[in-house]
């Protein structure tokens, strides 16, 4: 074997090595572009909040708040809402959007995914899904919560995690079967339909690098018969409202959609609309609870 031939073989092996590394790393780089965690404190801890540390299934320590109903004992609340936030900030940034819920006689549980706020770890698709499941399990086992009256509120990316946590991936080779016990209603606010679709909107072709098993469009049909409410602003500058139209078409009954004229991203429960969409959510929850 000549020296020149040896060099060609080494060069070919090196190129092959680079290709393998890229195939392995690029999907991880692409999905990490979805997450913008920080530990900045955007406001004081709510006075009524119980600060919680709970453990994900893989041992990661996660931080949450339990804010009881403003009316009487928590176990007698209309429901307990588990809030699953989006891909940026932490729960202190999202608190103003849901601070009204305890005044409607519901308990509220908020938590931060791994790597967000005071929670340990590093974000990943599977990690955030496991964190969401662990949060639901934690609330189910609280002595002061009625485990048969749970509501999931997923905002933006949180909607994908909610649906993946209580649904299973339709069309996937290895389907996940999730525990839907006690989940009486699901509310999705400004949720994108799939990781690949939103990635392709940002960088054409990048969606092929992502794992869509955790995407809303793969899981929404399988959460039936849990009622689903979908809200989205028609002027959302982050996620097109058409994503929610697609999700509504895929969802099974019972389902409801509300499109907010000129509404922006996760805008439904902001102060812009007073109680209009807050009332709609509470009415939806009460209807879902009365169905059984």
Swiss-Prot record:
Xref: Pfam families: Hydrolase_4
Stretches that traverse the bilayer: 13-35
GO CC annotation: membrane
Gene3D superfamilies: alpha/beta hydrolase
Keyword Membrane set for record: yes
Membrane topology: Single-pass membrane protein
InterPro entries: AB_hydrolase_fold (IPR029058), Hydrolase_4 (IPR022742)
Main location: membrane
Family the UniProt entry places it in: Belongs to the serine esterase family.
Protein name, per record: Uncharacterized protein YfhR
């Amino acid at each position: 074997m000549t020296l020149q031939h040896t060099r060609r073989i080494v060069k070919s092996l090196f190129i092959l090595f680079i290709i393998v590394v890229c195939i392995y790393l690029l999907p991880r780089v692409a999905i990490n572009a979805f997450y913008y965690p920080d530990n900045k404190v955007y406001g004081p801890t709510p006075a009524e909040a119980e600060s919680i540390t709970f453990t994900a299934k893989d041992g990661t320590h996660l931080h949450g708040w339990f804010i009881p109903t403003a009316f009487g004992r928590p176990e007698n609340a209309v429901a307990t809402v588990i809030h699953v936030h989006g891909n940026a900030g932490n729960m202190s940034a999202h608190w103003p959007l849901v601070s009204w819920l305890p005044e409607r006689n519901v308990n509220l549980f908020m938590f931060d995914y791994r790597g967000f706020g005071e929670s340990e770890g590093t974000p990943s698709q599977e990690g955030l899904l496991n964190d969401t499941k662990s949060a639901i399990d934690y609330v189910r086992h609280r002595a002061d919560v009625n485990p048969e009256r749970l509501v999931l509120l997923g905002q933006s990316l949180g909607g994908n995690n909610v649906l993946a946590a209580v649904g299973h991936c339709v069309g996937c080779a290895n389907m996940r079967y999730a525990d839907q016990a006690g989940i009486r209603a699901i509310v999705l606010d400004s949720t994108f339909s799939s990781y690949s679709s939103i990635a392709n909107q940002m960088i054409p072709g990048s969606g092929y690098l992502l794992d869509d098993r955790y995407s809303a469009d793969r899981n929404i049909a399988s959460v039936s018969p849990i009622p689903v409410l979908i809200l989205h602003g028609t002027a959302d500058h982050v996620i097109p409202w058409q994503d929610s139209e697609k999700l509504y078409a895929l969802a099974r009954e019972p389902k409801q959609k509300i499109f907010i004229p000129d509404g922006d991203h996760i805008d439904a429960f902001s102060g812009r609309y007073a109680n209009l969409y807050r009332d709609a959510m509470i009415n939806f929850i009460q209807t879902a609870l009365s169905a059984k």
